Amino acid sequence: MTDRYAVFGHPVAHSKSPQIHATFGRQEGIAVDYRAIDLAPDAFLAGLEAFAADGGVGANVTSPHKEAAFSVCTTLTARARRAGSVNTLLRKGDRWHGDTTDGIGLVRDLTDRHGLDLRGRRMLLIGAGGSARSVAPAFLDAGITELVVVNRTPERADELIDAMGEPGRAISRYWEDLRELGDFELIVNATSAGRDRDVEFKLPLSLVNSMTTAVDLNYGEAAIAFLAWARAANCRNTVDGLGMLVEQAAESFLQWHGVRPQTDEVYQTLRQGAAVLAGED
C-alpha cells in the first residue's frame, strides 16, 4: 500500500500544502502522495481513521481541527503538550503521534526571512483557539517580554494562559479592554475572522507604535482585512502566514521523511502569486 499524506481542514480547498509538499518531494527525490481533505468537525475523527486505514501515515491539520487532533494522539512532543494543539500527525503502528510545528515555523519565518529580533518585544495575540495555542509557546521561547492574549470568549484566553505556565510573562485581558492595553511591538492575529469577506478589523490605533510588526497567521484573502487595518494604522511591517506555512511544512516533511528541505524556492514561487500580500512594507 502506498504511503499517503494529507492536510485536513474545513474549508481546505484553498490550501497550498499539497503544492508545497510536492515541491519538497521533487527537491529531495521523494515521491509524495499528498492531498487536501475537507472534513467538517463532526466528521474529523472518523475521516482520520479512514485515512489511516487507506495508507495514511502522516498528516497536517489546520483550522478547525487542531485541538481535536491533539485529543486523538497517544504520544505527543513536549511543545504540542504545552500548546494543547497539534498540526502534524505521524502514524506509529496503529496510533498517532502529534507535534505542533506552527510556532517554530512562524518564529523561523519572522527571524530568518524577515530579520526580526523578537527578544524584548511586547506581543498582543488576538484569538485563543488552536492556531493561537500552537504559536504562543514558541514566542515565549523566542524571548518576548510579555504576551497579552485577548479573545471574545475570555475563558478561552484564560485557558491558553494557564497552559503556558508563565504567569509573570503571559496574561489574558478582555476584548473590551483593548484601548487600555498600551502599545505593542508585535500584534498577531490568530483568528479566522478574515475568512468572512465582509469583516472589517476595527482595532484601536493606540495598540501600534513606531516599531510594530503586524502578523496574520492566515494567508491569501483571509489575511486581507487584518493586514489592511495594519497598513492603515502605519505598522512598520506587515506579514501574512505564507512564510509560516512553508516553514512549518518543512518541519513536518522532516519528521515524515528524515530530511529538512530548502524553503526559499517554494516560498518565492508562492509569494509571486500573492504579491498583493507582500510580506513587508
From Swiss-Prot:
Family annotation (InterPro entries): Aminoacid_DH-like_N_sf, NAD(P)-bd_dom_sf, SDH_C, Shikimate_DH, Shikimate_DH-bd_N, Shikimate_DH_fam, Shikm_DH/Glu-tRNA_Rdtase
Binding site for shikimate: S15, K16, S17, T62, N87, D102, Y219
Molecular function in Gene Ontology: NADP binding; shikimate 3-dehydrogenase (NADP+) activity
Keyword Zinc: no
Keywords: Amino-acid biosynthesis, Aromatic amino acid biosynthesis, NADP, Oxidoreductase
Residue numbers binding NADP(+): G127, A128, G129, G130, S131, N151, R152, T153, P154, E155, R156, L217, G241
The name this protein goes by in its record: Shikimate dehydrogenase (NADP(+))
